[in-house]
């Protein structure tokens, strides 16, 4: 089972990724983890990537694709894999297609922007422990205070409404075209096209999980 999981920040991808990994016993592969591992191992591609990273530049797509091809040859990928946060752009998706990296399913977790802003801007965090709350969905016993210590909760910069709105803008500009790319490819019925599935990310986590796993044949 080879899966790409798409969706905006705050759509609940991380939660569903865990369910998919467990159901199919496949590794979750992120480009960040892959880059760090290759740099640490000192592979040729890892050293090449490190040069770009050290200079503050973006690692080029051909290096990323090379790392992907290396990673999916590992023993833990024999039953498949789940790509998390990759590909991010159409050139990366095209490069992956040209490199012969076949995908079975592309799953999009679809949540409206206003719901994502509500979810993320309502988060409150107790910084010393990392405990998180939500003003609507999981409020603390006393507003603005940690349940355990009684200390103040804060809204992290990442969770502020204007920051969330900016991240969504980047997502729509950069990643949303991938949704069209994969859905059009699937609709054309090409022999090696992945199946494209859009699942609503609204509602109970368990129901979304059921729909995702059912779409993947579980």
Swiss-Prot record:
It comes from Methylobacillus flagellatus (strain ATCC 51484 / DSM 6875 / VKM B-1610 / KT). It catalyses: AMP + ATP = 2 ADP. It comes from the Bacteria. GO terms for cellular component: cytoplasm. It is found in: Cytoplasm. ATP binds at residues 10-15, 123, 132-133, 203. Signal peptide: none annotated. Residues 30-59 are annotated as: NMP. One of its GO terms (biological process) is AMP salvage. GO terms for molecular function: adenylate kinase activity; ATP binding. Its EC number is 2.7.4.3. Consists of three domains, a large central CORE domain and two small peripheral domains, NMPbind and LID, which undergo movements during catalysis. The LID domain closes over the site of phosphoryl transfer upon ATP binding. Assembling and dissambling the active center during each catalytic cycle provides an effective means to prevent ATP hydrolysis. This is Adenylate kinase.
């Amino acid at each position: 089972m080879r899966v790409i999981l798409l969706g905006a920040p705050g759509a609940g991808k991380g939660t569903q990724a865990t369910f998919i990994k467990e159901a199919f016993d496949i590794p979750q592969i992120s480009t960040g983890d892959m880059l760090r591992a290759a740099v640490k191992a000192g592979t040729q591609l890892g050293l090449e990537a490190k040069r770009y990273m050290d200079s503050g530049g973006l690692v080029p797509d051909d290096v990323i694709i090379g790392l992907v091809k290396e990673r999916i040859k590992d023993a833990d990928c024999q039953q498949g894999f789940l790509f998390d946060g990759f590909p991010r752009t159409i050139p990366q998706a095209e490069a992956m297609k040209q490199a012969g990296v076949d995908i079975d399913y592309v799953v999009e977790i679809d949540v409206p922007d206003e719901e994502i802003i509500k979810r993320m801007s309502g988060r409150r965090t107790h910084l010393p422990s990392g405990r998180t709350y939500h003003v609507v969905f999981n409020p603390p016993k006393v507003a603005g205070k940690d349940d355990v210590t009684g200390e103040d909760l804060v809204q992290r910069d990442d969770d502020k409404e204007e920051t969330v709105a900016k991240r969504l803008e980047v997502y729509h500009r950069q990643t949303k075209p991938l949704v069209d790319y994969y859905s059009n490819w699937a609709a054309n019925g090409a022999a090696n096209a992945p199946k494209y599935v859009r699942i609503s990310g609204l509602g109970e986590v368990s129901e979304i999980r059921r729909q995702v796993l059912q779409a993947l044949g579980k």
